[in-house]
UniProtKB/Swiss-Prot annotation:
Function: Catalyzes the formation of N(7)-methylguanine at position 46 (m7G46) in tRNA.
Signal peptide from the UniProt entry: none
Name of this protein: tRNA (guanine-N(7)-)-methyltransferase
Encoding gene, per UniProt annotation: trmB
Transmembrane segments: none
Catalytic reaction list: guanosine(46) in tRNA + S-adenosyl-L-methionine = N(7)-methylguanosine(46) in tRNA + S-adenosyl-L-homocysteine
Keywords assigned: Methyltransferase, S-adenosyl-L-methionine, Transferase, tRNA processing
Organism, as annotated: Chlamydia trachomatis serovar A (strain ATCC VR-571B / DSM 19440 / HAR-13)
Amino acid sequence: MKLPYFWEERSPQIANHVFYVPNYYSRYEEFVMPTWQELFANNGPICCELCSGNGDWVVEQALKDASVNWIAVEKRFDRVRKIWSKMGNYRVNNLLIVCGEAQTFFSHYVSDASFQKIVVNFPDPWPKFRHRKHRLFQDLFVQDMMRTLVVGGQLTLATDDYNYLVNAITVMLKYLSPGLKSPHYINVKDNYGGSWFENLWRSKGQEIFCTEFIKRVGI
């Protein structure tokens, strides 16, 4: 698997179940995004995972129920290649990979009320204060995720970083309804679903936290 373009010739394109969304590009709107029905060849519900890593978690979810379509968003091409390999090895047909930044994909190519569920698994916490502007859970992007959820849709975050968790909950409380009682998170012991990052942090003895928020009527 290779990138379908040289850097100087980069442009959004879809090939072999991968949607390539290049960085530092100014003509996103020129690409005509196919409908979800055209991409998945069905009208089934769609769920989206952000920060998919090597794809262990999302491939497992896609295999559990073939009637549910999944989108895996991962910005690193080396990881996208691993997800793509797993798709082929397990013959997964209900998964689309997005190779690019989540914010760019959502703002330019995801229409309102597209997703039943959005799951953000172990995002980079950007712990240094001067780097916090790079965090996913900021007002503008949380509003964009809310926009793309159906009414009753769910936004889930799993992380090993407690401070990141608390900050993300603070932002989500502005726009969504908590699905868990205060303090709005749980400590995940098991049964979350395997992923490379989850296994890594558990092997280091770190706790795994999970929070869930719901889009209510009128939001």
